């Protein structure tokens, strides 16, 4: 009997919980404690709204003359009447990017192409052929709406798309 009591005492000592003390205290509690009431203030919510991120990127401000000092230019107001359309990125830039794969394969990617992407490929090939002296190697992905061109032509293609009105 003494050994059993000694083991029970050690068990309580190891876990830090004495036998039977938790149930007795829980049964004698009253209802929920009375907390002080609160006042809902909508005047200070403007400070919270400043911390919340914007749900969409605002439209760029109107400028007196274009291109702006950063080089940004808005798209032409009536969009060009072409069988394809190149939508701007969410930051209102032309979606033409450089891409490098396998360590040395340099590609230019035109994203967000809607409509007849094959007509865009033909126009890009017609535009780049005099610059290269040969027809550039291109890859069309109709599902994602991207056109990949072998080589770095991002600045030339951005200027060409701006000239077309995108």
Swiss-Prot record:
Q: What organism does the UniProt record list as the source? A: Pongo abelii
Keywords in alphabetical order? Mitochondrion, Ribonucleoprotein, Ribosomal protein
InterPro entries given for it? Ribosomal_mL49 (IPR007740)
Q: Decide whether keyword Mitochondrion is in the record.
A: yes
Give the record's GO biological process terms.
translation
Self-association and partners: Component of the mitochondrial ribosome large subunit (39S) which comprises a 16S rRNA and about 50 distinct proteins. Interacts with OXA1L.
Major location, coarse class?
A: mitochondrion
Its protein name is Large ribosomal subunit protein mL49
Q: Extract one GO cellular component term from the record.
A: mitochondrial large ribosomal subunit
Q: Which Gene3D superfamilies match?
A: SUI1-like domain (3.30.780.10)
Keyword hit for Transport: no
Q: Which family does it belong to?
A: Belongs to the mitochondrion-specific ribosomal protein mL49 family.
Q: Where is this region: Disordered?
A: 56-78
- GO MF assignments: structural constituent of ribosome
Compartments annotated for it: namely: Mitochondrion
């Amino acid at each position: 009997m003494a050994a059993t009591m000694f083991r029970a005492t050690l068990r309580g000592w190891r876990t830090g919980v004495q036998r039977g003390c938790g149930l007795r205290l829980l049964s004698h509690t009253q209802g929920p404690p009375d907390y002080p009431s609160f006042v809902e203030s909508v005047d200070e919510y403007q400070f919270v709204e400043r911390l919340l991120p914007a749900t969409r990127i605002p439209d760029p401000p109107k400028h007196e003359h274009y291109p702006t000092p950063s080089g940004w230019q808005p798209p032409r107001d009536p969009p060009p009447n072409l069988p394809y359309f190149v939508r701007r990125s969410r930051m209102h830039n032309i979606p033409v990017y450089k891409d490098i794969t396998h360590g040395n394969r340099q590609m230019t990617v035109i994203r967000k192409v809607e409509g007849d992407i094959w007509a865009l490929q033909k126009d890009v090939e017609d535009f780049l052929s005099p610059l290269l002296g040969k027809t550039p190697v291109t890859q069309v992905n109709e599902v994602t709406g991207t056109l990949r061109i072998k080589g770095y032509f991002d600045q030339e293609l951005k200027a060409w798309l701006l000239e077309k009105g995108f």
